[in-house]
Amino acid sequence: MRRILIAAWICILAAVVASSWMYRRSTRFDFIIGQAAARHGVDFHLVKALIYEESWFRPGIRGAAGEVGLMQITRAAAADYTKRTGFPGYRPEQLLDPALNVEIGCWYLKDSLTRYRDSPHPELFALLRYNAGETPTRNWLRLALESPPPAGAEPETHFLSLVDYPKTRTYAGRIL
């Protein structure tokens, strides 16, 4: 009986430590996220959910396709940001700076939300663009406009069913 109690206490302690560690990890960038989200007029919670999905709040992470940082910024997105905002040139390693990374990510997300503001589900199509790029997202939007959700169907679920990239479909579904 004593061993069972000790094991139970160890499990409880491990759960408390893991929870506090995850809480700390997920809140330590809230100030940066809040500033950038407000500056670009995007929802704070949407940005946090995107960061969780992209990097699990790990600022130094690098993706297989060369994307980096909390919001997994690509060089192409960073180049577009510098060109369209007049931001001075940057060195690729600067994209690992959480403040710059979140700034560019929020700018890109806002650009996507603006681009798809007239779509049937702007947040969904913005996330699809963020993950898969412009061309596939335009194709999915065309399909969505050609086949509206059936009566009684959840629009988000219907539009996600049109996405033929399984990872992108899961990505957007998890964020929303």
Language-model segments: residues:
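Non-catalytic cell-wall polysaccharide-engagement segments
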Residues: 2-11, 24-27, 31, 38-40, ...
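Hydrophobic alpha-helical membrane-insertion segments, chiefly the h-region
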Residues: 12-21
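Extracytoplasmic
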Residues: 28, 42-47, 52, 65-68, ...
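Generic hydrophobic alpha-helical membrane-segment signal
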Residues: 41-42, 57-60, 121
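Short amphipathic alpha-helical surface micro-motifs
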Residues: 51-55, 153-156
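Cell-wall polysaccharide-cleaving catalytic domain and substrate-binding groove, primarily
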Residues: 52-77, 133
